[in-house]
Amino acid sequence: MADRGQRRGCAPGIASALRASFQGKSRPWTQTRYWAFALLTPLVVAMVLTGCSASGTQLELAPTADRRAAVGTTSDINQQDPATLQDGGNLRLSLTDFPPNFNILHIDGNNAEVAAMMKATLPRAFIIGPDGSTTVDTNYFTSIELTRTAPQVVTYTINPEAVWSDGTPITWRDIASQIHAISGADKAFEIASSSGAERVASVTRGVDDRQAVVTFAKPYAEWRGMFAGNGMLLPASMTATPEAFNKGQLDGPGPSAGPFVVSALDRTAQRIVLTRNPRWWGARPRLDSITYLVLDDAARLPALQNNTIDATGVGTLDQLTIAARTKGISIRRAPGPSWYHFTLNGAPGSILADKALRLAIAKGIDRYTIARVAQYGLTSDPVPLNNHVFVAGQDGYQDNSGVVAYNPEQAKRELDALGWRRSGAFREKDGRQLVIRDLFYDAQSTRQFAQIAQHTLAQIGVKLELQAKSGSGFFSDYVNVGAFDIAQFGWVGDAFPLSSLTQIYASDGESNFGKIGSPQIDAAIERTLAELDPGKARALANQVDELIWAEGFSLPLTQSPGTVAVRSTLANFGATGLADLDYTAIGFMRR
């Protein structure tokens, strides 16, 4: 099954021609959503990264991570003892758009860039290592224990020094309020994900206000991820009511509790500044500040070159070549749980509401050629991602994609059988032309995916209409409201892959933007999340994935190679892989 689609892929000559036509200058990971609600004992693997530049000359980049490294094996962050770094400094990063909502639990705040920024300011329960291992973050909790299994009970004991930036102590009420808000019990809360909260029976006070006892109504396999990885804890003041939850952070974040706080917002200059939190009780951060500038995708690499920002993702060979030849810039790489895909819209009334049509069209999209073109020179063996739950390299990953393996002749037969007959270049049925709208963020590299799909679908008589949009309102105005037939964007996962099952793939999932589902998928998700044995849970998750493929839910395309161009003097920052960043340790090396 794993090889079937590869054997049916485009011939090398076709891939080479497409690659030459579509070689872009922007990274394909600009528009991303968080996949659920990851990691830190980093390693730097010194290897030689070789590739061919656009001119065919050999390019050597060293040191950097091995292009063949798997998820869960490495981070590449220039690890240094924080005590040896400069005291002070400003880390300059970029955002695609000014956040529409700073509440990362809200559907409009569930954006990878926003959440990455807020991680420096909010509590999390565990520190995640490069191998996905979890260690209690003692800045916030002195212990987190699974104290019972029948019923499942988790006890959080909060660090007595932990306080919000407004001076309010962090207590069990913050945990209780957030779990209630995102549980789905009150539909007025516009949540991005329930993240296991829907399985909680109660949250009660423990021995004192600094202890929360969480009792589950149903077992939850990924309980460690409720406030870790991509998950964070917000103050009760921001989650107590739907009004506070939905609108309390539209103009800026609420109280925080990290080593940094958001201290300045300038919508005119499109700038956000984080500075040291004066109430922070943990290790003193090396940096004075972190500044985020809103830049469109094409402006990021030039901004790195002219010393306006200090790091940016690299998504094409052209970008890699330019960045590697820029004085003072290093290339750091560690594959992470980030992946790009096509979400299909099967909502009632949409052209793809018919599952049989979705599957036929899926068989007409050559995912192997997409991978080979989009990741040419970035990985040693570009292949598509073939699982919705696990990324390649994670325990549990297997290829379940055979049901939609690229087979244009089969796709043509199925379209004929469905009554979509050729009329000239494209197909029609009952006087309606088979036109599919493809929504994507307007960058050259994201356009690669769209153009290759457009080319291969045209061969089977399907017209793909490309709809490029800017970063502003991409999710809130289009994806979230289902204004697409196919939507291209990325998911950013963490060390808790099962956490995303309900959020994305359940019939009523908060991030099921295509409104596709089935009772069988819902039941399989429930069986998976209720299984506390990790090996059995992974096997059950693959049964879920098989059902997702068979439903024509979405098409995973490529997993990010995790390549980042970083100022060479910047330490403890870069390509993290699965690992968490330690924001107190990031800094610049002494000259």
Curated annotation (Swiss-Prot):
The keyword Transport applies. Keywords: Peptide transport, Periplasm, Protein transport, Transport. Changing residue 230 to G: More than 50% loss of glutathione or bradykinin binding activity. Disruption phenotype: The uptake of glutathione is compromised in the oppDA knockout mutant. Transmembrane segments: none annotated. Changing residue 496 to D: More than 50% loss of glutathione or bradykinin binding activity. CDD domains: PBP2_Lpqw. Changing residue 491 to A: The ATPase activity of the OppABCD complex is significantly reduced. Cannot bind an endogenous nonapeptide. SUPFAM superfamilies: Periplasmic binding protein-like II (SSF53850). GO terms for cellular component: ATP-binding cassette (ABC) transporter complex; periplasmic space; plasma membrane. GO terms for biological process: peptide transport; protein import. It comes from the Bacteria. It is found in: Periplasm. Its main location: periplasm. One of its GO terms (molecular function) is peptide transmembrane transporter activity. Pfam families: SBP_bac_5. PANTHER family: MONOACYL PHOSPHATIDYLINOSITOL TETRAMANNOSIDE-BINDING PROTEIN LPQW-RELATED (PTHR30290:SF65), PERIPLASMIC BINDING COMPONENT OF ABC TRANSPORTER (PTHR30290). Belongs to the bacterial solute-binding protein 5 family. The complex is composed of an ATP-binding protein (OppD), two transmembrane proteins (OppB and OppC) and a solute-binding protein (OppA). Part of the ABC transporter complex OppABCD involved in the uptake of oligopeptides. Peptide-binding protein that shows broad specificity but a moderate preference for hydrophobic oligopeptides and those that are 6-16 amino acids long. Can bind the tripeptide glutathione (GSH) and the nonapeptide bradykinin. Glutathione (GSH) uptake by mycobacteria through the OppABCD system contributes to the depletion of the GSH pool in infected macrophages, which impairs the ability of the macrophage to detoxify methylglyoxal (MG) and contributes to enhanced production of inflammatory cytokines. This is Oligopeptide-binding protein OppA.
